[in-house]
Amino acid sequence: MTGTYTTNELERIARAVRFDTVAAIGHLGVGHIGGCMSIVELLTVLYFDAMNVDPADPKMEGRDRFICSKGHAGPTVYATLSRRGYFDRGLLWTLNVGGTRLPSHCDMLRTPGIDMSTGSLGQGFSCAVGAAIGSQWAKDGATIYTLVGDGESQEGQIWEAAMLAGNHHLGNLIAFTDRNRYQLDGDVEDVNGLEPLADKWRAFNWNVIEVADGNDISEVRAAVREAQALRESGKPTMILLRTVKGKGVSYAEKLGAANHNANFPPEETVKALNEVAGFDCVTEEDVRTAHFPDLLERRVE
């Protein structure tokens, strides 16, 4: 899959993913808007440039896997999967309603393309380590990708799994930290500081790649390719992404820690969607009725 799309094409896809994520959360009226916005570029690069997956066969043997350990960012995962062709875009407007296939947190029993149920912080990362060990045993050539939040990185389970991954020389494991610096209770460094974070990962026998702008497609793409090239190093790789919580949505960016799980009223949703689109294309009635334009003329296959 690597190299199929130009940077400009990936940026266009990312804009559509961001728009659809905002639309889904806005139609519901509440959600983890901040932590969803900060990872849009990463997921776009993974699913449209890096990962060996087949939407027509979500359980394909030897496929790469992505486990979103910060499971509250499920809406962005869903928007990305929809754009990649796993299911119809209209399903996004059923986010977290009764009987939906798209609960607020990732659920492998409900949603095509989800490889692990997550939400209890720290557990998804541990499962990714286990999946990487299993892939090594199976010799299937797969790469396991996983994403943790920086607030989540205060969980002891993260570091137990990190130690195991380093000791088992999991070169087939690439992890990301969404370093947006905010958690539910405030600034991560004020609540329970992580720095020097890169040194900590190196001490656990991991390669570390630091990305100055984790919301820049080119920088994220380059980091992922660098990590892929380190597969034979015998070490897992952690990519630290410095991101902006709520990226691309002024309302969400200003909320800081308050946007961990925030109300998203129709009037703010309209502003946000028009801001992301770059032109006026949505009304409050559209938000209520889930009548949202498609920023891409066609689904990207």
Segments the model singles out, each with a brief description of its role:
Residues 86, 90-108:
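Conserved AdoMet
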Residues 53-59, 63-65, 105-296:
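Glycine-rich ThDP/TPP pyrophosphate-binding loop and its adjacent helix/strand module
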Residues 297-301:
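Non-catalytic terminal/interface segments that mediate subunit docking, oligomerization
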Residues 44, 79-82, 93:
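Generic alpha-helical structural context detector
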Residues 45-49, 83-84, 133, 164:
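Active-site catalytic microenvironments for nucleophilic, acid-base chemistry
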Residues 2-74:
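N-terminal amphipathic, basic-rich helices that act as targeting or association modules
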Residues 75-87:
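Alpha-helical support elements that line or immediately flank enzyme active sites
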